[in-house]
Amino acid sequence: MKKLFYILTMLLLCHTAWADKLELRLLNHWDNPDGTVERGYAGKSIWKWSMIPAGKKQMPDSLKARYEEYGRINQQYGINGTVLNNVNAKPIMLTHSMLQKTAKIADILRPYGVKVYLSINFATPKALGELKTADPLNPKVQTWWKKKADEIYHLIPDFGGFLVKANSEGEPGPMDYGRNHADGANMLATALEPHGGIVMWRAFVYSAQGGDRANQAYDEFIGLDGQFKDNVIIQIKNGPIDFQPREPVSPLFFALKKTKMMVEFQITQEYTGGSIQTCFLAPMWREFFDTLGTIKDRQPLAGAAGVANIGDADNWTANDLSMVNWYAFGRITNDTEASSKNIAREYLRSTYTTDERFVRPITQLLLKSRETMVDYMMPLGLHHIFAGGHHYGPEPWCNPKGWREDWLPKFYHRADSIGLGFNRTDHKERCLAGDEGSGNVNQYPEPLRSLYNDIHTCPENLILWFHHVPWDYTMRNGLSLWDNLCYTYDRGVAEADKFVDTWKAAAYIDSKVHARQMKRFERQAKDARWWRDACLLYFQQYSGMPLPPDSPAPTHTLDDLMRYHLDIDNYTAAPIDRLP
C-alpha cells in the first residue's frame, strides 16, 4: 500500500509540475528540546534529542527508521524542508552538541530532498553567556552570528536557514535595543548569505497597547517594505489574528510590494479541535489562495510553512483522519489551484481503500467538516472566543485576573445590548464600547476594502469580523442576526451528528482504525453541543432575545459551563473522556 501511495503521489506531483508551485514548502515543528510540543496533540516530539548522539556514534536504529519514514512521507507529499524546533526557541539549540545532533537528522532527511532549518532565539549570544548584548548593530554580535553560521554549514552544508519569532509574546528581538525588524533580519541574513541560507522572519507581532490586533502586523511592517535583504522572507500567518477557523486574508500579502513573503498555515489543530475533532483544512487554504488571486497587483509568494500536526503517536497524528491535512498542505503548496475534493479523494483512495462505498461519503464528510466546525464554534465571523490557555472548547466569558485585554474574548466579540461583532470599518457603528471603527478595512486594496467596509456587501461569513451588528439587524435571508446566529449553531450541531452516522455506515476499512475514529466523531458531536450551548446562552444575556421556537433547548446550563475548567496546558491534548 505504501509503495502504491508513493507511485500515485509522484504521478500527481509530476502532473501538476506546471501549476502554481511554491518554491519553499516547509513544515514548522513547534517542538521543544525537552520533548514537549507546543499546541501538539499527537504525543511527544519525534525529535528525541536525548537519544541522538552528539559525536561520531551512530543514530539508534529505531530513530533512524522513524526519521527515514518521516523523510519518505514528506517527499511523497511534496514537502522540501522542515524547521525542527519551536519558534519560541531555546538558545540551547545553537550549542555545538545540538548542532551535531541536528546534522545527524539532516543526513537522514537529505536523500528525500528535505532540507533542515532551525528556529533561533534572537538573544542566543547573550543567553549563552558569550556576549553581553544581542544588539544587531553591534559588531561583536554580527561577528558571533557569522561564526555560528560557519559552524552550522561546516556540519550541515545544505542547511536551509533560520526561522525567527522576535519581539512577539515576550520573545527577544531587535526592538529590545531600539532597532527594527529589518535591522535584526538583515544582520542574520548577512551571516547566512555566503552559504546560501535564508531568514524567515515572522510577522506575528502584536502588543497590548497596539489597538486592533488585526492592524498591528501591517502597521509594523509596511514602513519597512523594501528594506530587507534578498535572502529574507517575511513569514505571515494566513489571517491577521491567529489561525482562527475563519479569517480574512492578512492585508500584508497585498501591501508589501518590495519584500519577499511566505504564508504560514497551521496544520496542527490548535483552534479546530485538537486531535479529537475532524476538520479538513484544504477548504480553508483553498479560500486563502482564491482570495489572494482576486488581487493581481501583489508580490508572488516565495513559499509556505505549515505548523506540523505530528508527534510520536504510532499513526503520527493521533486522529487518523488528521493525516489528510499533512498531505493537503504538501499537495496545495505544490499546486495552489488544486481542488479540495481532489485532495480528499486522492488521500482516502491511496491510504484506506478504493471502495467508493467508503471514499464517496467520507470525501463529502471531509469537505463539509471545516464549514461545520465554523458553524458550531465561531460562525458569521466570530473569532477568539475559545478557552484561555489551552484553547480547547468555548469560553466567550474568559476573563482571568491580570490578563491582557487583547487575550480576552470580549476584546473580539464585543457583545453588548446593541449587538455583536468588531467594528473594523472606517466609520461609526453603534456600540457601547465606542462607535469608531478600527480602520482595518483600509489596509485592504480595492475591491476588498469597499466589500468589507459596507455591512450590506460584506460577506456574511465575515460580517461579525468587520462589523458590530445589531441583534435585530435583518440579514439577507430575512431573519435577524440573533435568529441567524442560533440557526447557524444548530446547523453545525446537526451536521456533527450526521458525521457520526456517516462514519458508522462506512465500515469498509480496518476495524481498529474505524472504531478508534468512531469515538472521536461521537465526542465531536458532544463538543458541538458544548460550543452551541455555551455561546448562545452567553450571548443571550446581551441580546435579551429568546431562542427561535424551533431551535432545540440547550443540553447544558450556562452556570454549569462557566464552572467547568479543563485543567491541561499548552502541550497536552484534551482528554476525550473528561469533557462536558
Task: Describe the residue ranges of each PLM region.
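Catalytic-core regions of glycoside hydrolase
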Residues: 30, 57-58, 133-345, 351, ...
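Sec-dependent N-terminal signal peptides
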Residues: 4-13
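Structured segments of extracytoplasmic/periplasmic soluble domains
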Residues: 73, 85, 155, 191-195, ...
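Hydrophobic alpha-helical membrane context
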Residues: 14-15, 177
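Catalytic domains of carbohydrate-active enzymes that cleave complex glycans
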Residues: 297-580
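Feature activates predominantly on carbohydrate-active enzymes
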Residues: 18-163, 193, 280
